[in-house]
Every structure is written in structure tokens, then in C-alpha cells.
């Protein structure tokens, strides 16, 4: 059986990257929430 996590750097960046997050209002909300929480990494 194929595992669910098939690592791919490009896909990772394009779906969860900083630029993608900052593009939409909800994504910016995600970044703001993670900044407020004090996350060491706010995006991939």
C-alpha cells in the first residue's frame, strides 16, 4: 500500500509556502495567528 505522505518540495512550497499564504485574506490571517502565537516558523 502506498503511504499518504509522498514528500515533494515544490508541492510543499506551492501549497503551504509563505507567498501562497500571504496571497489570500485567510492565508494572511493564518500568518498573523502564527506570529501572535510566537511560532518559530510562520510558513514552510
UniProtKB/Swiss-Prot annotation:
Q: What Gene Ontology molecular-function terms does this entry list? A: structural constituent of ribosome
List the residue ranges of the region (Disordered). 21-44
Record's keyword terms, sorted: Ribonucleoprotein, Ribosomal protein
Decide whether keyword Ribosomal protein is in the record.
yes
The superkingdom listed in its UniProt entry is Bacteria
Record-linked Pfam families: Ribosomal_L34
GO CC terms in record: ribonucleoprotein complex; ribosome
**Record GO biological process:** translation
Output compositional bias ranges, type Basic residues. 30-44
Does the UniProt entry include the keyword Ribosomal protein? yes
Please name the InterPro entries in this protein's record: Ribosomal_bL34, Ribosomal_bL34_CS
For this protein, the record's PROSITE patterns field holds: RIBOSOMAL_L34
Q: Which family does it belong to?
A: Belongs to the bacterial ribosomal protein bL34 family.
Q: What is this protein called in UniProt?
A: Large ribosomal subunit protein bL34
Q: Which organism is it from?
A: Pseudothermotoga lettingae (strain ATCC BAA-301 / DSM 14385 / NBRC 107922 / TMO) (Thermotoga lettingae)
Q: What is the lineage of its organism?
A: Bacteria, Thermotogati, Thermotogota, Thermotogae, Thermotogales
Amino acid at each position: 500500500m502506498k503511504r499518504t505522505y509522498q514528500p515533494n518540495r515544490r508541492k510543499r512550497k506551492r501549497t503551504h509556502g509563505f507567498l501562497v499564504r500571504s496571497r489570500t485574506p485567510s492565508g494572511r490571517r493564518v500568518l498573523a495567528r502564527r506570529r501572535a502565537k510566537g511560532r518559530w516558523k510562520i510558513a514552510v
